[in-house]
């Protein structure tokens, strides 16, 4: 569902008609009082994309350092608009040569270009918004994320037709806000090496429910989280491949930090308030810690052994990092001083998980004293105070099952989880399951194209 906010310039035509009738009036020396004509806004002219010579008047500009997605969107726009008009439109990056002047150039700006008009249009945009705006000789098409930029392009093309001479209405300034539902999740799509964010409120996993995506450089994307950084704002964390972990801005998708020095087969990643990132690796059997003051960090600042390490999660209340290994749940204090990371296990918090092969560690939203822990045979809620692994929690009849790779709950008590179907790999699935708080059985939500390993409630809160 879309809510359209249209900001349309008023077009006012004011005509003054003066008439005389009857006998001429007496001649007088007095100068009659007159009322000044009201000032009016100039009538904005329709924007012609094609010049009188039949050639394209505008060129398409894409960000030189934009994502592959936006680059392809700009190329697709060139193709579509050229086919629509029968006129060839050129395309180039926003890179400006020395002494090159672009202020007066007629340009269609796609995505977050370096032009000031793009920057102004992006102010205040969220991941759910996009803008189509005519400013002078620039047409700005930009979204709060790549998906929204794509939607903006589709709307822009729908405004053009042969009936109106392929003109854009003068003064066009449209902002669209796409309303989202209550159930936003992240999925690690191993079939395409994509981190994908979906709104599953309507029970769909398709293009209409896709909110955001980010292409990972390697195979087997495993774990992800949304966090808020004081320095960077909202960031997406992800791990994949043999030893790769990264932090990207959300939703801009700018790579802020990465490492290729995690232990083998990374499964989980966490950003702590002090800026340290922890990565748990299963095959490597370690949790490694990295500083993030530089964009690339290929030397771990600290590491601790943990057999079949699968999950890490920061606990704001207790000031510790929880971690799970094969049958172990434990916690660590993580200090950063003068660039040095010190990790100390809180042995009094260590507990033995009652079943083998732990898979996932997640917060129980609504209960800061509980954690979700999944294994090869059970789904537990761990009580931090009593150090007990409970299976008598709400909806355990549906949720406590074998081989769940990822689980989480929403504020209203609904839960989402995933377990393998083996269609792509033995640990992936095309479907996720949403247990709504008013239902006794989980909805099956299937993708026609994705093959997912982990599902994560897309929420920046640690607890």
Question: Where do the model's predicted regions map?
Answer:
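Sec-dependent signal peptide cleavage junction
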Residues: 15-35
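Solvent-exposed alpha-helical segments and adjacent loops
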Residues: 32, 36-180
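Short coil/turn segments that connect the beta-strands within blades of beta-propeller domains
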Residues: 181-183, 232-235, 274-276, 317-319, ...
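Conserved beta-strand positions in repeat-built beta-propeller and related beta-rich domains
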Residues: 185-191, 237-242, 278-283, 321-327, ...
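Short loop/turn segments immediately following beta-strands, especially the blade-tip
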Residues: 199-205, 291-296, 333-342, 383-393
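Aromatic (tryptophan-biased) beta-strands that constitute blades/sheets of beta-rich domains
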Residues: 201-222, 254-262, 298-302, 344-351, ...
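Blade-loop segments of beta-propeller domains
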Residues: 208-270
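Repeated scaffold domains used in trafficking and secretory/extracellular systems
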Residues: 217-229, 263-272, 306-314, 353-366, ...
